[in-house]
């Protein structure tokens, strides 16, 4: 059966601007062919089995020649694959999507075009520049500064463009900005016309500088701006200082590494992005089944013998009930057991299953959990099931046993080091570094150190800051002779995000 090619616009850079249709197609892609300006965070939406092919497309960057790329798309589809051709912005706006579609039609390959949000409108918006405004202009013109180099003559009518009222938006014009400004001036546009240049628009690296047509080239050189840059020419560019919302957020300009598992990173990453940070998701752990499930089966079979089940993580809740419902159909088979949850995320997971929680310690540590349980009742001969990770810290079961409890410490899952870099974030970190690294568990500290040499990196980059979610994580950092820059007062994801803002 013949496959299909989807020409998908990835948007201008902010991963949140991908369309719902684009996200849906990535989730079922067999092959993804992506360009340089695509936010590689989007690649993580695809299944782990998806073949990833880098197409290049940046100036002076190694790329698959367009003709070869066209053939590749057709070949993969003919082989029965679902192919997503992921292109920055919109496929049909200065993206050669039309050429790719034409080749697919010639080859008889089915295709679909999924429009994307173009940098033409998105980047000025993120810089506080409306392209139209009742007080300034009612139209805008879009210009490419990078025409086909094989053309004998420019297709751009500079006389008409200069005289055209309204805003002018220039894409891909960095290398020729001096010539473009001169052409506009020569054809009648005032050298005093306001202008703005936005680099890496809609991303955490966004920078905006203002100028006039006459000073564009000088200001560009001073700022050492390199592609990608969107240039806006016209009176609306004067509004950027007043209307700029994106660059005014508390963590703007900060690159923050999130080390949680891919499944768990979403909430923290989302909060940090909302606060303006550029987030690099580098999972350090992956959740896998435990070494043996025999102890699990034994504990589930005898579930009615326990007085308490203690969960220390949402993962523990999830994996416990996965096993439980394989053995039982009815939650009432839990009997009269009581539930304790360490931390609000753990409690939330239990409540999602409509489980009433009998005990939540005020602080989220082993010592606090043991004390809370002891305050609740005498623990002599009380039977406790600890449903948690393999090789977890032994402090909690030891403290409970010291008070006479009978503890079964059962591993319902195991964490292993994550080494894959599906979204390119690890490569980005290695190349450009970061301002912050956030840690939400001791294992994330140890695995990050094993992969990147955390202690050495902190020594080499003294401005690198470390954020810990709580005492157990801080303890793991101290074992490496490292001290966190900040520790969350509330030992939750919310607390971790909040402490970065306060710092």
Identify the residue ranges that each predicted region occupies.
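Class I S-adenosyl-L-methionine
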Residues: 1-15, 20-117, 122, 222, ...
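Structural motif
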Residues: 4-7, 30-32, 50-53, 81-85, ...
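A glycine- and small-aliphatic-rich helix-loop capping segment at beta-alpha/alpha-beta transitions
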Residues: 23, 99-111, 128-134, 186, ...
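Alpha-helical segments flanking ligand/cofactor-binding loops in enzyme cores
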Residues: 23-24, 74, 102, 159, ...
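Short, charged beta->alpha transition segments
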Residues: 40, 69-76, 126-130, 154-158, ...
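Conserved beta-alpha
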Residues: 49, 113-124, 139-151, 175, ...
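A glycine-rich beta-strand to alpha-helix segment
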Residues: 70-125, 130, 166-182, 193, ...
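Conserved anion/nucleotide-ligand pocket segment
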Residues: 147-196
């Amino acid at each position: 059966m013949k496959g299909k090619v989807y020409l998908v616009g990835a948007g201008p850079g902010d991963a949140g601007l991908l369309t719902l249709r684009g996200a849906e197609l990535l989730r079922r892609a067999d092959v993804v062919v992506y360009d340089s300006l695509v936010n590689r965070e989007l690649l993580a939406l695809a299944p782990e089995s998806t073949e990833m092919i880098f197409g290049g497309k940046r100036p002076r960057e190694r790329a698959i020649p367009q003709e070869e790329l066209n053939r590749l798309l057709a070949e993969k589809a003919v082989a029965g694959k679902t192919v997503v051709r992921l292109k920055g912005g919109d496929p049909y706006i200065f993206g050669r999507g039309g050429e790719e579609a034409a080749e697919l039609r010639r080859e008889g390959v089915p295709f679909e075009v999924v429009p994307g949000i173009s940098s033409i409108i998105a980047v000025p918006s993120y810089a506080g520049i409306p392209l139209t405004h009742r007080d300034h202009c009612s139209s805008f013109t879009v210009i490419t500064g990078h025409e086909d180099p094989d053309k004998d003559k420019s297709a751009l009518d500079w006389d008409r463009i200069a005289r055209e009222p309204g805003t002018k938006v220039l894409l891909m014009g960095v290398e020729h900005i001096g010539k473009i400004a001169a052409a506009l001036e020569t054809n009648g546009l005032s050298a005093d016309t306001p202008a703005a240049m936005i680099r890496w628009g809609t991303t955490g690296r966004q920078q905006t500088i203002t100028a006039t047509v006459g000073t564009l080239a000088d200001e560009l050189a001073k700022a050492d701006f390199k592609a990608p840059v969107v240039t806006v020419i016209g009176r609306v560019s004067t509004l950027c200082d007043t209307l700029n919302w994106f660059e005014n957020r508390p963590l703007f300009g900060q690159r923050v590494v999130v080390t949680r598992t891919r499944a768990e990173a979403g909430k923290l990453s989302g909060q940090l992005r909302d606060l303006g940070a550029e987030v690099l998701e580098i999972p350090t752990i992956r959740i896998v089944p435990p070494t043996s499930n025999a102890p699990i089966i034994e504990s589930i079979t005898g579930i009615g013998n326990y007085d308490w089940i203690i969960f220390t993580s949402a993962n523990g809740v999830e994996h416990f009930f996965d096993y439980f419902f394989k053995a039982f159909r009815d939650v009432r088979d839990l009997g009269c057991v009581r539930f304790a949850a360490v931390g609000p995320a753990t409690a939330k997971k239990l409540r999602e299953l409509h489980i009433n929680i009998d005990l939540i310690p005020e602080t989220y540590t082993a010592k606090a959990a043991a004390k809370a349980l002891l305050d609740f009742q005498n623990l002599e001969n009380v039977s406790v099931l600890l449903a948690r990770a393999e090789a977890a810290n032994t402090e909690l079961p030891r403290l409970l046993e010291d008070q006479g409890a009978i503890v079964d410490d059962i591993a319902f899952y195991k964490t292993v080091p994550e080494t894959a870099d599906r979204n390119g974030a690890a490569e980005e970190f290695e190349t450009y570094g970061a301002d912050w690294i956030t840690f939400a568990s001791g294992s994330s500290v140890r695995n990050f150190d094993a992969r990147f040499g955390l202690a050495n990196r902190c020594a080499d980059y003294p401005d690198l800051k470390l954020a810990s979610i709580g005492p157990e994580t801080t303890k793991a950092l101290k074992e490496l002779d490292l001290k966190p820059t900040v520790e969350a007062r509330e030992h939750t994801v919310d607390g971790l995000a909040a402490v970065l803002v306060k710092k």
